[in-house]
Regions:
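Flexible "stalk/tail and boundary" regions
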Residues: 110-125
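Short, surface-exposed beta-strand/loop "edge" segments at domain boundaries and coil↔beta transitions
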Residues: 13-16, 41-44, 65-70, 125-127, ...
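Short hydrophobic/aromatic-rich beta-strand motifs
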Residues: 5-9, 26, 150-154, 280-281
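Surface-exposed intrinsically disordered loops and tails
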Residues: 122-141, 164-180, 184-186, 225-269, ...
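A short, polar beta-strand/turn micro-motif
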Residues: 41-112, 137-222, 274, 281-328
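C-terminus-biased signal that marks the final domain/tail of proteins
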Residues: 265, 269, 273-281
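Beta-strand repeat architectures
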Residues: 2-40, 47-58
Length: 328
């Protein structure tokens, strides 16, 4: 099919990693299923409908891309996966949901309620979305990723070094706005930071995001890496006076990986392409609505370019010989 053809899926269909699929609109009906494998992509001009009643019948695998051109509503839940490699117990990752209605506890069931964090621009600290007086999600009553393009820091409590984040819900589409906060009268370097995220089931281009919002945000994105395994640097305690850095940084001149004083290599270097499910931090120049413009190519920020990295990915251990020198 091409982008001028309406597609109805009545039997299992798989888009392989080397395939770029296209359709005017697509409907998956009873008996059908659609899977986009890693490095594969599907571009849909109009709507997506999963009419099977199960999100498992429409799957976007990790490193696959589902793109849409027009600002139309979708119906029916799908599954979007994001692999996070080399995860360690108690580490954080910055996440954002590419679907609506995803709950925190179904996304990361072993994470305690108090270890889902949002960022508070007004005091430059992370805060739990849990209400400490009731031990429930009092600061986020629905217990869900509240809005498209909002980022969250989530602690990992698993035992494997590979975590597959699984999002289930109606895929986000259309132009999306995120209300940037900026503390009134603030002039210090610690203010204006907002945790946002990629709101789509496709990669996005940060440079295009900045170009569309250059009066509101600086041309810099910060990605948390966990390259420095220091518990005191987690959450609102960062950086705890340390002279090391857990953030990989992208700006207008390129990317810089996070640095470490421990026996690991530096983190991957970010480029302009931000992966599905990725949360990150931007600094606002003023309060206002950050605009995520739908569409691909010149008409929007969405892209199938897979050359970027998903952060949390740490460097590999470096073998070292330690020498002790003594006088005779």
């Amino acid at each position: 099919p091409d982008i001028t053809k309406c597609v109805i899926v009545k039997s299992p269909v798989r888009i392989n990693g080397s395939t770029i699929g296209a359709a005017k609109n697509i409907a998956v009906q009873t008996g059908g299923s659609l899977t986009i494998q890693g490095n594969g992509s599907l571009l849909v001009k109009d709507f997506i409908r999963n009419q099977t009643g199960s999100a498992n019948n429409f799957v976007v695998e990790s490193d696959a891309n589902l793109l849409q051109v027009n600002n139309v509503s979708n119906t029916g839940a799908i599954t979007v996966k994001r692999d996070a490699h080399k995860m360690r117990y108690l580490e954080y990752t910055y996440w954002a949901s590419p679907v609506s209605g995803q709950t925190f506890k179904s996304f990361s069931p072993t994470t305690p309620d108090a270890r889902f964090y949002q960022y508070n621009e007004s005091n430059d600290l992370f805060e739990s979305i849990q209400n400490p007086s009731t031990n429930v999600f009092g600061n986020n009553k629905s217990g869900t990723f509240e809005s498209a393009a909002k980022g969250y820091a989530i602690r990992y409590y698993g035992t494997s070094n590979l975590f597959t984040g699984t999002f289930k819900g109606v895929p986000n589409n259309g132009d999306i706005t995120f209300p940037l906060k900026f503390k009134s009268g603030a002039t210090g370097q610690g203010y204006g930071y907002n945790m946002v995220g990629n709101p789509y089931p496709s990669n996005i281009d940060f440079y295009k995001l900045h170009a569309a919002n250059s009066t509101l945000i600086y041309n810099t994105a910060y990605f948390w890496t966990n390259i420095n395994p220091n518990g005191a640097m987690q959450g609102s305690n960062y950086p705890n006076g340390a002279l090391i850095n857990n953030y990989a940084v992208l700006n207008g001149t390129g990317g810089v990986g996070a640095t470490s004083s421990s026996a690991v290599n530096g983190s991957q270097t970010p480029n302009q392409f931000i992966k599905v499910g990725q949360g990150f931090i931007v600094k606002a120049k003023a309060a206002g609505d950050l605009q995520f413009t739908n569409g691909d190519g010149t008409n929007g920020i969405r892209t199938s370019n897979n050359s970027g990295h998903f952060f949390n990915n740490r460097g590999t251990t470096v073998d070292r010989f330690w020498l002790e020198l003594k006088t005779p």
